[in-house]
């Protein structure tokens, strides 16, 4: 019995190899990692070599000083990741010191989140230390995420040769030159995410030859900004929350294979659609106003389309036809329907709406290569037998339309 008690209370974790201990501790909050130093002599210095660090401030006035003291004791020469999240206002000098420490430790993934502002203004934003980025002394940084009250002022071109992913979330730019100098100094950039919010800049230019994935979300609520995209290597494009799609100008994207369009209220300028000629996968989140026109434009602009996904999780009663308006079929059947479309998915299909029934019938009637079609609809209560039977009739009709043109796998789901 005594031997069993000793076995159950044995400190077997401390017997692990130090490299494995460090690996385990890298997944824990940094505050917890430091607390392990009091467990035993063996644990006293293990935390000093952990390479994944995350510091979160909850309005702690001495937070910056605490982080400085931590790094004075921390011994790891390289950092895999450093995540700094501030809830209290931070001076530009403090931000510069912290970023300088990160660069000196050859950080690979850096996250800075200064979410302390009460209003969206450059006056309370801390300036990112641009001087640390203009020299060829940072060869390890691969991912950079900047959020909220950070002012990006780059009077000179940066030198971030290893940066592959950049995420800019509601930050402030000191003019279009700062945007240009930042993006032009990232020759290895592959993935760019830009989420803008009431930023007063007429033109936002994204000219990155190496860029493969681009996500743009604009929450400006009509403030207006024109996006100019020049990315000849672009393969994936995600556009969200544009009030007007004609505010996005794509100059060159011959490699584009997948595109997603979400919450776009209107489309007038067809320029952006010219870049979809090579797209094979297209996903559209249906918006309240004339969504069928957007779909028609997309189908006509994507002759090589193989996968089409339509999504309307809101199932809004305001979406679709207004009085006196109706969907107008394309003059000619789009090439993608005639030769290439293999998968058609409609999530949130409103089978009771005339416009949606017309669109579904048109697509199924004109596809010749369709292999699978999936329609997800809102569930119906069992007591509503008449409604249930009517829906089944509509869905059976759609299935027969598809099978009349080609053998397909039809799936009907409730969401």
Curated annotation (Swiss-Prot):
Disulfide bonds: none
Pfam families: F-box, FBD, LRR_At5g56370
Source taxon at top rank: Eukaryota
Residues covered by the F-box domain: 10-58
Database matches in Gene3D superfamilies: 1.20.1280.50, Ribonuclease Inhibitor
Positions of LRR repeats: 60-86, 87-114, 143-170, 171-196, 213-241
FBD domain mapped to chain residues: 272-377
Keyword terms: Leucine-rich repeat, Repeat
InterPro entries the UniProt entry points to: F-box-like_dom_sf, F-box_AtFBL13-like, F-box_dom, FBD, FBL13/AtMIF1-like, LRR_dom_sf, LRR_FXL15/At3g58940/PEG3-like
CDD domains (alphabetical): F-box_AtFBL13-like (cd22160)
Protein name as it appears in the record: Putative F-box/FBD/LRR-repeat protein At3g49040
């Amino acid at each position: 019995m005594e031997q069993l008690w000793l076995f159950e209370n044995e400190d077997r974790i401390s017997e692990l190899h130090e490299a494995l201990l460090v690996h385990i501790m890298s997944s824990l909050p940094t505050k917890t990692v430091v607390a392990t130093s009091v467990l035993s002599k063996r644990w006293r210095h293990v935390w000093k070599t952990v390479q994944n660090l995350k510091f979160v401030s909850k309005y702690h006035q001495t937070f910056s000083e605490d982080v400085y003291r931590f790094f004075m004791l921390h011994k790891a020469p390289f950092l895999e990741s450093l995540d700094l999240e501030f809830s209290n206002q931070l001076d530009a000098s403090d931000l510069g010191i912290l970023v300088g420490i990160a660069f000196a430790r050859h950080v690979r993934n850096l996250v800075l989140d200064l979410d302390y502002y009460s209003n969206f203004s450059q006056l309370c934003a801390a300036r990112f230390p641009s001087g640390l980025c203009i020299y060829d002394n940072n060869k390890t940084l691969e991912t950079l995420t900047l959020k909220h009250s950070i002012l990006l002022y780059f009077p000179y071109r940066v030198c971030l040769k290893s940066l592959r992913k950049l995420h800019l979330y509601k930050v402030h730019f000191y003019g279009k030159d700062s945007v240009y100098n930042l993006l032009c100094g990232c020759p290895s950039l592959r993935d760019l995410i830009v989420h803008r919010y009431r930023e007063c800049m007429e033109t936002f230019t994204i000219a990155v030859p190496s860029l493969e994935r681009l996500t743009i979300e604009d929450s400006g609520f009509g403030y207006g900004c024109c996006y100019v995209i020049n990315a000849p290597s672009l393969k994936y494009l995600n556009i969200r929350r544009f009030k007007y799609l004609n505010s996005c100008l794509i100059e060159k994207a011959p490699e584009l294979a997948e595109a997603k369009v979400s919450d776009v209220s209107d489309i007038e300028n067809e320029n952006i659609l010219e870049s979809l000629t090579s797209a094979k996968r297209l996903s559209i989140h249906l918006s309240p106003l004339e969504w069928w026109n957007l779909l028609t434009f997309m189908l006509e602009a994507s002759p090589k389309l193989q996968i089409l996904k339509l999504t309307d999780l809101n199932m809004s009663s305001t979406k679709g036809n207004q009085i006196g308006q109706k969907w107008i079929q394309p003059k000619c059947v789009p090439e993608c329907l005639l030769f290439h479309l293999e998968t058609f998915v409609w999530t949130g299909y409103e089978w009771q709406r005339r416009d949606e029934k017309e669109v579904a019938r048109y697509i199924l009637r004109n596809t010749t290569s369709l292999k699978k079609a999936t329609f997800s609809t809102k569930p119906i209560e069992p007591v509503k037998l008449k409604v249930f039977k009517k829906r089944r009739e509509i869905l059976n009709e759609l299935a027969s339309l598809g099978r009349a043109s080609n053998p397909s796998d039809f799936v009907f789901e409730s969401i």
